[in-house]
Swiss-Prot record:
Cytoplasmic-side positions: 422-449
Positions of region (Disordered): 72-101, 154-187, 215-381
Keywords in alphabetical order: Cell membrane, Glycoprotein, Golgi apparatus, Membrane, Signal, Transmembrane, Transmembrane helix
Organism: Homo sapiens (Human)
Membrane topology: Single-pass type I membrane protein
Record topology, Extracellular segments: 21-400
Source species taxonomy: Eukaryota, Metazoa, Chordata, Craniata, Vertebrata
Any one GO CC term of the record: Golgi apparatus
Name under which the protein is recorded: Uncharacterized protein C11orf24
Keyword Membrane assigned: yes
Amino acid sequence: MWTALVLIWIFSLSLSESHAASNDPRNFVPNKMWKGLVKRNASVETVDNKTSEDVTMAAASPVTLTKGTSAAHLNSMEVTTEDTSRTDVSEPATSGGAADGVTSIAPTAVASSTTAASITTAASSMTVASSAPTTAASSTTVASIAPTTAASSMTAASSTPMTLALPAPTSTSTGRTPSTTATGHPSLSTALAQVPKSSALPRTATLATLATRAQTVATTANTSSPMSTRPSPSKHMPSDTAASPVPPMRPQAQGPISQVSVDQPVVNTTNKSTPMPSNTTPEPAPTPTVVTTTKAQAREPTASPVPVPHTSPIPEMEAMSPTTQPSPMPYTQRAAGPGTSQAPEQVETEATPGTDSTGPTPRSSGGTKMPATDSCQPSTQGQYMVVTTEPLTQAVVDKTLLLVVLLLGVTLFITVLVLFALQAYESYKKKDYTQVDYLINGMYADSEM
């Protein structure tokens, strides 16, 4: 089977090179496919005829490049895509010719040829549905082709995943045709998402992806294709219904590339449900905050009167500093300050002011003593002159010592001056003596005299 598929693929490559020279190499096909994905998602959002036609032109050509069933199939698909932009009615004939070409080129695998024939019809129906959804004739042709493609999609999903190893994109097109007839646009996004996988990955990966997705598409085909094949407007009606939930799907449906039309309302319901918890979550969020604020407010007033008497030593300190400025009344005022909280302290402070200073000390031993002493210092300046004179006596002693030292220094200086004056006077008396007298006598004459 693999050898037959490889031979068919090589033969298709040779025919593709001979009949139609592709401008772009096959290495860049996945890039085109992803570009087609982006464009297809844009067309799903806008749901316009022109955008859908452009998308089919951009997406179908890379699909044909990646298809490996036959070269004639590639060429015929390119011709059909070119014809889709021009004429819509002539496409089923070209698709039928493409199917004949495919069957003639692939005589080895009958099942693959039949699936290829159904695939080509499905692809042509896709191009017709995507390129010209407004024409009634093309819609009827798609409607007539859709049952066969639905049946072929069922067979492709159930019986021929083995033959769909290389022509995986085409098999996905067969699985997509009912979904395109049902929803129109999102199926192409799945097709484009699957094409690079089927073109680059081996058969096992394609079987895994195609078996799951084609089965889901086949199940939706059973539900959606009969609705779409009966009248042509029914095809447009689900497309409109699919287009209506598409705008809310934009952030999510484009990312995972919605596979089935059934997934769209599911995503819509999730979109609808997600804002509800998001809205509800902030609503309870402020309510506990309000509760906490009310609790904090309730706690603050309750805590504020209670610790005021307990923490009163700190305000007592503040109150003590101004109240102790008048010397006779500091203790009574301090007793009146905390007296509002504790009455027995008033009696104790009135009886013994010393105990009042020791009263706040058990509350805060070091805090109240310091301001008490600080407050007592300015008050005691008027009360205890003896206490204040002690540093003054020391200063006077220091000053007296300095004065004594000055007097001693002055007396010494005066004595030195007197001595110098006496010596000067003596020298002045002896100025008349000459040097000869001094030499002869050895002394001054006045000294003897």
